[in-house]
From Swiss-Prot:
GO molecular function, one term: DNA binding
Name the record gives this protein: Zinc finger and BTB domain-containing protein 8B
Known role: May be involved in transcriptional regulation.
Region listing for Disordered, in residue ranges: 436-484
Species whose genome carries this gene: Mus musculus (Mouse)
Entry GO CC: nucleus
Stored Pfam families: BTB, zf-H2C2_2
Domain BTB: 24-92
First and last residues of each zinc finger (C2H2-type): 331-353, 359-382
Subcellular location: Nucleus
Domain of life, per lineage: Eukaryota
Annotated InterPro entries: BTB/POZ_dom, SKP1/BTB/POZ_sf, Znf_C2H2_sf, Znf_C2H2_type, ZnFinger_BTB_dom_contain
């Protein structure tokens, strides 16, 4: 058996002990106010007090005192009453303070209660606002209806419907339709005003004239903006301008007729783009621009294109924020957001992603992504058609160079090549004075063939080498020979 009221009675007894300060073994000071409580209650409900009692209170037999600086006294009093009674006193003024205090004291149940209260309060406020808005709308509608009825009564004669002698026929309810629809036939009259008639169907049968409740009301014209209608009007205007242009072209020479056709096409293109972008001008503006363009065309063939440019400049000047976008086909990179106008530029850009180098050097095997890089490399590193001075022995070579000399600037003897036949073929020392003329002619031809030329001074200038390397290399080489 379980007693349902036992927990409530136990909490009531503990709350009475707290109020009378019976067996209270701890005190909490909040903003100068002292609150008496029991450790067991605080330990069981608050994670903050549980950690405080476990780690910081060593003397369990003495009276303990805790001080809270963040929590307000009113919020802590409300939370303490909830711990001993199970009832949380919340209102719109203290709900935020209580929720923040409960969050600091690690009391999740109180935090959830506060959140639920806030949601319900917001729902109630929204519901009240909706009801107030509906009531205000109904009051405004009633006031407007009363004002309209009063105005109609003051304007119309006392006879009611007889005053509006517009040839209005009787309204007959259709017995087939169960919704009380009316068939109204009104003769053409310029002085009558439209009336809104509300029919009340009595007992689902035929409707007599007495059963009709007539509520006259003046209907004001409603102005709506229809993009489709504006486009149709623009097309009609273009068609109207097309016929005069056709007659004008028949009486003009061929070149003038061609200019007029080209100009009318551009005007139509501008108008269509203007309508498509949403910046539709009024009918008067369109007539003004079109007439201005036609006047410019009638002046002569040389002024036709200038008139079109005038229309375009006027459009840009009036709508400075809108830009007429000309469709251009862009090539997109499949690896990144890069776009290019030419397919070759995109292909060269894709090589940076794939690592492709389609231009190899025939001499050293190095590969390049662009052909101009290969040409610059061949001119600056592999200069086989020009006299080169060996970095080791200082000999000048003009014939077919070996692989080592072309790549590293050293002759075969300096690169430890022992084949004498290759040395005789490759190494041909000549006098520098005899080679100057040929070198100048070679340089001129190179500059004509290769406009981009990069020369390294370290490979051609013998004075740029370090003097420390000469005694280590020259003892191992034969004596330099000179040609007379």
């Amino acid at each position: 058996m379980e007693a349902q009221s036992y927990c409530a009675k136990l909490l009531g007894e503990l709350n009475e002990q707290r109020k009378r300060d019976f067996f209270c073994d701890c005190s909490i000071i909040v903003e100068g106010r002292i609150f008496k409580a029991h450790r067991n209650i605080l330990f069981a409900n608050s994670g903050y007090f549980r950690a405080l009692l476990l780690h910081y209170i060593q003397d369990s037999g003495r009276h303990s005192t805790a001080s809270l600086d963040i929590v307000t006294s009113d919020a802590f009093s409300t939370i303490l009453d909830f711990l001993y009674s199970g009832k949380l006193d919340l209102c719109g003024e203290n709900v935020i303070e209580v929720m923040s205090a409960a969050s600091y004291l690690q009391m999740n149940e109180v935090v959830n209660f506060c959140k639920t209260y806030i949601r319900s309060s917001l729902d109630i406020c929204r519901k009240m606002e909706k009801e107030a808005a509906v009531a205000a709308a109904m009051a405004a509608a009633a006031a407007a209806a009363a004002a309209a009825a009063h105005q109609i009564d003051s304007e119309s004669p006392s006879s009611g419907l007889e005053g509006t002698s517009c040839g209005t026929k009787s309204f007959v309810s259709s017995p087939v339709d169960g919704e009380g629809s009316l068939d109204c036939t009104i003769s053409s009259c310029d002085d009558c005003h439209p009336l809104e008639l509300v029919a009340k169907d009595s007992q689902g049968s035929g409707v007599s004239d007495n059963d009709l409740c007539v509520v006259p009301r003046r209907v004001e014209p409603k102005v709506e903006f229809d993009v489709a209608r504006v486009e149709v009007e623009a097309d009609e205007q273009l068609q109207q301008y097309a016929a005069p242009l056709a007659h004008m072209e028949e009486g003009l020479p061929s070149n003038q007729a061609l200019d007029l056709t080209y100009s009318s096409y551009h005007v139509k293109q501008f108008l269509e783009a203007l309508l498509r972008n949403g910046a539709v001008q009024s009918k008067d503006d369109l007539d003004c621009h079109s007439s201005r363009g036609l006047e410019g065309r009638l002046e002569g063939p040389g002024v036709a294109m200038s008139s079109v440019m005038d229309v375009q400049n006027d459009w840009y000047r009036e709508d400075a924020g809108d830009v007429l976008v000309v469709p251009i086909k862009l090539h997109r990179c499949p690896f990144c957001p890069y776009t290019a106008k030419q397919k070759g530029i995109l292909k060269r850009h894709i090589r940076s992603h794939t690592g492709e180098r389609p231009y190899p050097c025939e001499t050293c095997g190095k590969r390049f992504t662009r052909q101009e890089h290969l040409r610059s490399h061949a001119l600056s590193v592999h200069r086989s058609s020009r006299p080169i001075i060996c970095k080791g022995c200082r000999r000048t070579f003009t014939s077919h160079l070996s692989q080592g000399l072309r790549r590293f600037g050293l002759c075969d003897s300096c690169t430890c090549v022992t084949d004498p036949q290759e040395e005789e073929d490759d190494l041909m020392p000549v006098n520098l004075s005899l080679v100057e003329a040929s070198s100048e002619s070679h340089e001129k031809s190179d500059t004509d063939d290769w406009p981009i030329y990069i020369e390294s001074g370290e490979e051609n200038d013998p004075t740029a080498e370090d003097s420390d390397d000469k005694p280590h290399i020259r003892p191992n080489l034969p004596a330099p020979e000179t040609l007379t």
